UniProtKB/Swiss-Prot annotation:
One of its GO terms (biological process) is translation. The keyword Ribosomal protein applies. Part of the 30S ribosomal subunit. Forms a tight complex with proteins S10 and S14. Residues 38-106 form the KH type-2 domain. InterPro entries: KH_dom, KH_dom-like_a/b, KH_dom_type_2, KH_sf_prok-type, Ribosomal_S3_C_sf, Ribosomal_uS3_bac-typ, Ribosomal_uS3_C, Ribosomal_uS3_CS. Pfam families: KH_2 (PF07650), Ribosomal_S3_C (PF00189). Keywords: Ribonucleoprotein, Ribosomal protein, RNA-binding, rRNA-binding. GO terms for molecular function: mRNA binding; rRNA binding; structural constituent of ribosome. Belongs to the universal ribosomal protein uS3 family. The gene is rpsC. Disulfide bonds: none annotated. GO terms for cellular component: cytosolic small ribosomal subunit. This is Small ribosomal subunit protein uS3.
């Protein structure tokens, strides 16, 4: 039975960039665990702010964090109060100087993580999984996607036996590395247990840019 690789990880270094941008030798494991702690803390604290992606860069004793969100106002707060409180909390968590940048996601319906979280919230509010998936597909295709595939798995509708249901529209070429496919997951906590949501969105082809400054020839 064919198994699916994470479409984002497969494209890192081809058309996608790393979400943690730093280099380390001996303390690699410590910094990796610190990254995980930072991501978990931000995701828990900003769980209602539609956070799509958290990028972490390091330089000496400084950590630069870029938060991509569909609701920048909620993250920044009145007069920047929320983002300042978050920065202080992360300073204490890491023991390093933390700088936070906020990046606005203009089209939330083309972001797989945000679409998955939206479906998960609807499932928690007892909306039918079929209706939630079909509405998400319609919104994403209207936003300009070339294809979308959705999957919800678990005790659907309170059934005794867990199963997975898929809906898709358009094309999602998982094998084409130049295809810009966004992948996102979310979990819904229902009275019958957890439901898993997976979303694949095909946003068109991206041609890898070749280095313009590379010298050609023997010299």
């Amino acid at each position: 039975m064919g198994q699916k690789v994470n479409p984002v990880g497969l494209r890192v270094g081809v058309i996608r960039d790393w979400e943690s941008k730093w280099y380390a030798e001996k303390d690699y494991a410590d910094l990796l665990h610190e990254d995980i702690k930072i991501r978990e803390y931000i995701e828990n604290r900003l769980k209602d702010a539609s956070v799509s992606k958290i990028e972490i860069e390091r330089a000496a004793n400084r950590v630069n964090i870029t938060i991509s969100t569909a609701k920048p106002g909620m993250v920044i707060g009145k007069g920047g109060s929320e983002v300042e409180a978050l920065r202080k909390a992360l300073n204490e968590l890491t023991g390093k100087r933390v700088h936070i940048n906020i990046f606005e996601v203009k089209q939330a319906d083309l972001d797989a993580k945000l679409v998955a979280e939206n479906i998960a919230r609807q499932l928690e509010n007892r909306i039918s999984f079929r209706r939630a998936m079909k509405q998400a597909i319609q919104r994403t295709m209207r936003a300009g996607a070339q294809g979308i595939k959705t999957q919800v798995s678990g005790r659907l509708g309170g059934a005794d036996i867990a199963r997975a249901e898929h809906y898709s529209e358009g094309t999602v070429p998982l094998h084409t590395l130049r295809a810009d496919i966004d992948y996102g997951t979310a979990e819904a906590d229902t009275t019958y247990g957890k439901l898993g949501v997976k979303i694949w969105i095909y946003r068109g082809e991206v041609l890898p840019t070749k280095g313009k400054n590379k010298k050609e020839g023997g010299n």
